Amino acid sequence: MHREDSLRTLGLVAASLLCMCISGAAALPNPGEHGGHDRRDDRRGFTSGGTLTATQLRQLVAQMTLAEKVSMIHGAPEGTACNSNPASGPVFPVISPSFAGCAGQAGYNNGVPRLGIPPLRQTDGPAGIRLGHEATALPAPVGLAATFDRSAARDFGTVMGREGRAINQDVLYAPMINLVTVATAGRNFETLGEDAFLMGQIVSDEVRGIQREGLIATLKHFAMNDFENARMQTNIAIDEQTLQELELPAFEHGVRAGAGAIMCAYSRVNDVYSCSNDLLLNQVLRRQFGFTGWVLSDFGATHRLTDLIYGLDSAMPQGNNAGLRDEPDPGNLREPPGVGAPGTGRTLTSAVISGSPAVPVFNDWPAVPAFTGAQWQAALDDAVFHILTSMNRVGLLEGTPFGSHDTGGAPFLLPRPDLASLKPADFKIAQDIAEESATLLKNEHQALPLRHGDFHGAGVLVVGPTSVTPYVGGGGSAHVIPFDEVPSPFEALVAGAGRGAGVRYVPGYDLDGELVPPAAIGAPADSAFAGQHGWLRTQISTVLPANGAAPDPCSAACAADQLDPSVDYAATTLPAATAWRWQGTFTAPSAGTWQLKIFAAHQSNAQLFVDGLATNPNRRINLGLYASGGGGFGTSNLASWHGLVQTAKSHDPSSARFQQGGFTVTFAAGETHTLDLRAYADPSAPLQVRFEWVTPDWQVRSIAAAVQAARTATKAVIFVYDEGTEGSDRGGNDQAVGLRLPGYQDALIAAVAAVNHHTIVVLNAGDPVVMPWAGDVEAILQMWYPGQRGGPATANVLLGNTSPGGKLPISIPDDPSHISTFSPDCNPAVISSSPPNDGNCPLYPGAFEPGFISGDHSYKTIDFVTNGIFRGYRWHDHVGVEPLFPFGHGLSYTQFRYSDLDIDDSRGGGIEVSFVVRNIGRDGGAEVPQIYLGSPSNPPIGTDFALRKLVGFARVDLKPGQATRVKVRIDRRELSYWSVAQHDWVVAEGSRALYIGASSRDIRLRGQARIGR
């Protein structure tokens, strides 16, 4: 009995879940249950598809021992031979906690050597191959979405696919396809915007690009990992229509495109964890979408052994499932702590042999029925079959007895490309996409492009440190170590402007700060160094305390307390696998805002407390929930919680090994504050850490220098940024703060624009930011996080070598209150361990940081109540709020005219829309006409419809005076709505308006279509 059938028989669908009886009416092509996959057909003749059938895959499962099956579904951090080339070195490494000598990959699953099944080596994405190894740092995926270009998406995936294989990886944790729902979500830059249709179109081609190179693409995070704060403690309360129409379509598109794997999310959906959610994993993913591939958990996203029964295939590291760790559950479904090595699966093995008992309701943990050994065996066999199916799709099973290259136990792997040989082509793709993504938001008086005359006289002034310190990408799982030197926008602009051109640079904003002087810090009054200047340094336990509690003291081989004049460790003084605490007091000499800067490398975690969590919960900073990766190059999750503002996190220009976290805090004159910094060294390398700041006086002087230079400049180009990262949302718990540019960048822009009326702002942002200065500057160019070729790409756009053609995949509000998750009643200061909805923040539960207080704490913590189908531009239309810049907006250096609309609604339930677009300007450029469908004149009762929704688009490049007829097919699926009554897609019949425009608000043509069955 297969798992899907066993669930139907057992009737395990909880009554609290939405009933979704799928009739299979989806119009998208279904890959079917076949182990093979479409083969690649290109000029190189490379074939990625495997030859095994589903029957042969089942037979291969039958040949495996119980121990081999259990081993295969247990994920681990990395294997000891992860850097070995399968053609010449070890292929089947044992699982090891050591990262020494490895590529810094994210995950690892064992193979079966005797059957020729290789292990699976797994890398993070989704903006390039994220390892402790160099790769091409691509533009952020939100920038890819801004291209509205399917072919660019295919190229984007191709780069990751071939580079991943070149670095001996088999699985890529990408694309990320969670909607931009919360405007300040830390990982918005990793995803593809706020619109489900656009996301589905882009992800389909990205997946094809990845998998045709022989790398398994992993769609993540299934489902609704739409923000970072409290992502592990959030329940998503979502209705059936919204789930089907907004959250699931991109995953369906990715499945239809052949994605080999799905990563289930941390959150719960309608009270059930995503990684044990029968509705999502079995009813939707398996039966509705026809997915036969591999479902793996996010790291730490599993909770019970029964996750395997309910649809999970593989538990990745840090999870409670499959006997990996204890859980708050009295049932005997777990492996006792300390018994067996990670991944031995002792409890699962016992369940397969003897079955498992029923477990009653435990607090808010639901009851679990008893399962027989046969049911566990069927679930385990299904899980292994799904993993093998994914491997077969990219040709990883050709060395098995059923493969085309059976070698009697040795694996056969397709040739891997040489990484160095890929650089020229991949760099070009990276730069092309960065240029295509360039989104011109404003351009009064044709301020851009910069012209030859602008560089005469005082010339062009460039302001902002990210013009000289290239802003490559965001943090967390998406951080990529770029190949080679990364050219900056400033040096590319100087080179492009030509010899003798006037281009000056003034920082204006301090990205790095200065070392805190010893005289500014006093030792704690209760220490042996009371009355002296400096920091009390104490060695502490390496066990991270929960919820900001005081750390335990060091218990063995401890260093004596020391008085450090400053926190400045860049050598080997702080050994690997140790933990340290620095405490001191600071009295503000004057009122103002202070930028606190933390640099760290080789840290597994770091925390900074201002005035102590117990004294003031709003003064806590958490720096290192996301550990630094191999060699210290990985990104720390430098997060700010509870009101301290994250102002910067980038590479320290003096050392690529350091990561920087910066925070803004306001002090009154004469106030004394306590500072408490804790840092935990990575197990593999000595800790390096430095504490710096930017004082209020220094900020004033920085702005004044920029203003003085701007007075005489022909034009001022200001580079500003925000940063997203995994594990925290921008602004901590305060969305209004998170929507602003960090630090004093807003003040810098306002001051420069006040003295130079030809000010241009270049944004490196991964999501919406409010722009109080938008009316004071002439031009605004959004370059997103442009990757390692972002410098030349930015210069080309500024100089007019490339005309911007990007369109916003997100809406930009004019005020923090004009976002769908804003609530005037939300009170983030109300911190409680027993919500839901304490503080009246149901639209943004990330306002809290609840934790599991003890093992018997309820798993229900906070609820996220969605706005139904009204997100992004749909919400703005629904409530009648005008955004600052609408979804789909983007200007060009030329102009386009739309005309001659024709609508053919007689094509078998679909619609073909055609119209003419003409370039009426004097420059060549790209335009993205967009097609929006209006709501039906007589909508079904109980069903919501957007005022208009995106149903089609095309990107066209036109020379001056050139015209083209654009034809866009609108499928029947896009004319349908999800019927809660029928639990299926139903065409909304009758007359529907069609809007063709340059954005969701800039409508150029209108028409009507008669839609029938």
Which residue ranges define each predicted feature?
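Fungal secretory targeting signals
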Residues: 1-28
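Glycoside hydrolase catalytic-domain context in secreted enzymes
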Residues: 27-978, 984-1001
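Short beta-strand elements
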Residues: 1002-1013
